[in-house]
Swiss-Prot record:
Organism taxonomic ancestry: Eukaryota, Metazoa, Chordata, Craniata, Vertebrata
Signal peptide: none
GO MF annotation list: ceramide 1-phosphate binding; ceramide 1-phosphate transfer activity; ceramide binding; ceramide transfer activity
Species name: Danio rerio
Protein name per its UniProtKB record: Ceramide transfer protein
Gene (name only): cert1
Keyword set includes Nucleotide-binding: no
Amino acid sequence: MSDCSSSGSDEDLDPESELLDELGGKLSKWTNYIHGWQDRWIALKGNILSYYRSADEKEYGCRGSICLSKAVITPHEFDECRFDISVNDSIWYLRAEHPLLRQQWIDTIELHKAESGYGSESSLRRHGSLLSLTSAASGLSTASASSFKKAYSLQEKLAEMETFRDILCRQVDTLQKYFDNCADNESKDELHRDKVSDEEEDFPTLRPDADYLLNNNNSSKEKLFSVNTLKDPAGIDFKGEAITFKATTAGILSTLSHCIDILVKREESWQKRLDKEIERRRRAEDAYKAALTELKKKPHYGGPDYEEGPNSLINEEEFFDAVEAALDKHDQIEEQSQVERSRASRQISLTPDTFSSISTQKYLTKPHSHTSSLSSVDLISASDDVHRFSAQVEEMVHSHMTYSLQDVGGDANWQLVVEEGDMKVYRREVEENGIVLDPLKATHAVKGVTGHEVCHYFWDTAYRNDWETTVESFQVVETLSDQACIIHQTLKRVWPASQRDVLYVSVMRKILSTNENDPDTWLVCNFSVDHDGYPPSTRCIRAKINVAMICQTLISPPEGDKEISRDNIICKITYVANVNPGGWAPASVLRAVAKREYPKFLKRFTSYVEVKTSSEAILF
C-alpha cells in the first residue's frame, strides 16, 4: 500500500491542479457612462472572477466578483478586443489590448467554467480507496458492500476499479513468478534423473544383501529425497494466491456491474430530464418571442452598446426619449438653482447709498471696467485688432454680414420650424456622410435692450455661467486682443449621446453703417480653430462650430424733450449657427433636439439680458 500512497501523492502534482492557482491580468472594464472604460485588475481563481482597481489594491478586497458556473461569455460582434460576461442581470463589459489577448482570456475563463462544473478526468485518480488485499480477498468486502447501500458515485467506483487493477497486477506477477519457479524445478528434476540413471549403469548388478542395504540405505535415501521432494518455489502459497485472485476478479466484476447499473440509472434520469427540458423549451419558446420585445424596452442602458454610434442597439425613438429625459433633468436642476440664486439675491439688503448711486447714474455711459480682460464696453472698432487669426476673423465677419442678414426667402430652402411671437427659427436640412450639418437661423426682437448690450453679455465670459446651462466647464485658453480670445468649452453630457467639447475663437466687432438711415451693427463671431495646447481627447468628441450673434438697435424718438429710455429702443437679433457634431447620431433626434433647444436658448438669454440691464444705464 505504500506504493499506492506514493503514486497518489505524485498524482496530486498533476498540472491540472494549476487551475486552483489564481490567474490575473489587466483589462479595460466599462464602469459607467460618465467614466467609460477604465483599467482594472481582473483575477481568476477556480470559478470566481473578481476585479480590483489595481493589482496593488488586492489586499483591500475586490470591488466585485461573479461566479462562472452559469456565466455566458460573448465575444463582441464588431469590437475585436471586447468580450462580455453575463450572469443573470449582471453584465461585465471587458476589453483586452488586442484580439489575441482577448481570445486567451475567453479560453481560460471557459476552461475554468468547465472544470468548476464537471471536474477533470484526472480527478478520478485522486480519490483514495479503502480497499486492501485482505478486503479484496473477502469477495464482497465491507466497504464494497456498503457502497451499494450508500449509492457511491460513479467516480468512487472507478477509483475502486483502479485499486482492484493494482491488486490484480501484483497477484498476476506473483502467480507468474510461481509458475516460472515451477518450470525451473521441473527442468532440474529431469537433469537429476538422467544423472542417477548414468551412475546405476556404472555399477554391476548384484543381489543386495542385508549388509549392503544397511550400509547404503542412508545415502540412497538422501539421493531419493533430494530428487523427489518439491519445495514451494520462493515460499509462495499457491492455494492462497489462487483464492485471492478469484476474490479480486469477483470484486472487479461486482464493481463493474455496479458501474453499469449506475450508468443505466443515470441514463434513465437524464432521459427524464431531457423530456422535461424539451417540454420546458416548448413552453419557453412561445414566451420568448413576447418577452424579447419587452427585454428590448428595458436594456442595460449603462452599457457601451447603447451609446451613440452607427452600431448602437438603441433605436431612434428610444434614443430621443433618453436625450429628452436627460435634458428635462438638466432643466429641472437649472430651474432649482435659479430659484436658489434669486432667493439669495433677495436676502441681500441694499443700502441707501446704493439706491442713490443707481438713480444718479442710470442714464450715464458705463465706464470701462479693467477687472476683466475680456470686457467689451469701450469697443468701438476693430481696426487695431491684429493677431494670427485676424485674416480668418475678417473672412468670417464679412461672410456673416453678407449672407447671414439676407432674407430667408428665395432659393435658400429655409424651413420655418418654430414661431413664437417675434421669434422665428429657420432650418435647412443638410447631411454629409450621414452626419447632420443643418444650418440654423433665428430672428428675434427684444424691447428695452441694445445690440451692444446683447453682444456684450454674449461675448464676455464673466457672465457665461449666468445664462449658459449646457456648459460643464470652460477656460480662456489665450487672449488674442481686447476683443478676441480663444476659449475651450466642455459641454454637459446628455446620455446616450457622447460628451463633446469645442475650441473656438470668440471675437466681438462693431460694424459701422455706410448708410445714415441704417443702424450700426454689433456682432459676436465664434468659429472653431486648432490649438497645440488643447488637442482632441478620447474623453470627448471635438465638435466644430461657426456661430454668429448679429444685433442692430432701432430707436424710436421720445416725445418732446424727454431723454431716450429703454421703452424707446428695440434690439433686432439675427442668430446663425452651423454646427458639426463630430460624430454620428440619429438625424431625427438631432433635429428634434435643435427644434426644442434653440428657441429655449434665445428666450433664456434675452430674458437674462433684459433683467441684467433693467437697472443699468443704456449702453449704445
